[in-house]
């Protein structure tokens, strides 16, 4: 059973990193605008199978709620070749026509979904999200109406039932854009490594904007790590293709560095692919409290070189906690079924992919 999805979904997002996804790449993801209603609890028992492992999961999770193809509407409105400003306005308008539908039965088909919601207005398109491993429904999908008034009609109805299940329709809106990641953390660096040597090595990947060499407050000596900021995001992507880099005489571990705001945003939307996959927690390495006294960066696990399971600002552990709750829509994808629950497993994610 292959996943039913829209023809234009693939153009909705570009490949990049999870947590460090660039602004344009993250505009496609959607979050629920309304709080969970009673129907969510009622529908939670009907959901779909578990998520995919490794890179497959990263791509699927990252694209959940991606922009539904509304090319027909764009052509009708004359937006197909419009300016970027008009394109953004059209995209914002289309958000008013979309709905997230949770609590679906595993037996619900795309036709069932379209037939049910067509009584509220013309349905331009709809999709069901399927588990890429089992091919079974994950218990949620998306509906795109031709007019926003249809969404209002759906929301005005107190309860919705489809295939014997109480379902949970919600308005959907675009996720907030994310800042591009231009800064990296370099761990395991010898305090004796000259700044010129650091700049020379990392300058080979792209133009370095600044290098931060934190000092130990007690000894007034350099500590065993640094932060490097680049002019662009591309050098960070290149560097993150390898976990370890030899800088001078040191074998250094590289991780994406996030500000407190970026970290909180990443936690809000859940761990995702790209950079995250390359910083998976594991054992080993000397124990150094690197992050102590360096409060400009949220506690991302830099201080624990023992690689705890939740270290590195949500990069470790690989449990997809943000994805389990599906951006606030409720847990429709990780539910027990007659087939049993498909366990979530860690894995290497190489890029951000559309579903």
Swiss-Prot record:
PTM comment: Methylated by PRMT1, in an insulin-dependent manner. The PRMT1-mediated methylation regulates its phosphorylation. Arg-345 is dimethylated, probably to asymmetric dimethylarginine.
Modified residues annotated as Phosphoserine in this record: 71, 80, 82-83, 190, 271
Modified residues (Dimethylated arginine): 345
SUPFAM superfamilies attached to this UniProt entry: RNA-binding domain, RBD
Localization, UniProt: Nucleus; Cytoplasm
Positions bearing Omega-N-methylarginine: 272, 278, 280, 282, 345
Sites bearing Asymmetric dimethylarginine, chain numbering: 345
CDD domains: RRM1_hnRNPD, RRM2_hnRNPD
Keywords: Acetylation, Biological rhythms, Cytoplasm, DNA-binding, Isopeptide bond, Methylation, Nucleus, Phosphoprotein, Repeat, Ribonucleoprotein, RNA-binding, Transcription, Transcription regulation, Ubl conjugation
Name of a matching Pfam family: CBFNT
UniProt keyword Aminoacyl-tRNA synthetase present: no
The protein, known as: Heterogeneous nuclear ribonucleoprotein D0
Species name: Mus musculus (Mouse)
């Amino acid at each position: 059973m292959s996943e039913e999805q829209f023809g234009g979904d693939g153009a909705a997002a570009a490949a990049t990193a999870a947590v460090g996804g660039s602004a344009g790449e993250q505009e496609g993801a959607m979050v629920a605008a309304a709080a969970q209603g009673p129907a969510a609890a009622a529908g939670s028992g009907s959901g779909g199978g578990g998520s995919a492992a490794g890179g497959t999961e990263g791509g699927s999770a990252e694209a959940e709620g991606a922009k539904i193809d509304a090319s027909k509407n764009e052509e009708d409105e004359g937006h197909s070749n419009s300016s970027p400003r008009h394109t953004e306005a059209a995209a914002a308008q289309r958000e008013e026509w979309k709905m997230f539908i949770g609590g679906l039965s595993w037996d619900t088909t795309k036709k069932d979904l379209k037939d049910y919601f067509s009584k509220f207005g013309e349905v331009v398109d709809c999709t069901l999200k399927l588990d890429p491993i089992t091919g079974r429904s994950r218990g949620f999908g998306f509906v795109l109406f031709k007019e926003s008034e249809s969404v209002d009609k759906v929301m005005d109805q107190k309860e919705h039932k489809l295939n014997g299940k109480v379902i949970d329709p919600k308005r959907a809106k675009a996720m907030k854009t994310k800042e591009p990641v231009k800064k990296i953390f370099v761990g395991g660096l010898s305090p004796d490594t000259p700044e010129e040597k650091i700049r020379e090595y990392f300058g080979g990947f792209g133009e370095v904007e600044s290098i931060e060499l934190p000092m130990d407050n007690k000894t007034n000596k350099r500590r065993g790590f640094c932060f490097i900021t680049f002019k662009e995001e591309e050098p960070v992507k290149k560097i993150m293709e390898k976990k370890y880099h030899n800088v001078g005489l040191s074998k250094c571990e590289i991780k994406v560095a996030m500000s407190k705001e970026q970290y909180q945003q990443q936690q809000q939307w859940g761990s995702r692919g790209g950079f995250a996959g390359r910083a998976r927690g594991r054992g080993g390495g000397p124990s150094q409290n690197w992050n102590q006294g360096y409060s400009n960066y949220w506690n991302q696990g830099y201080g624990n070189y023992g690689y705890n399971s939740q270290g590195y600002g949500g990069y470790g552990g690989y449990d997809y906690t943000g994805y389990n709750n599906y951006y606030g829509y409720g847990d429709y994808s990780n539910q027990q079924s007659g087939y049993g629950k498909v366990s979530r497993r860690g894995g290497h994610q190489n890029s951000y992919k559309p579903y």
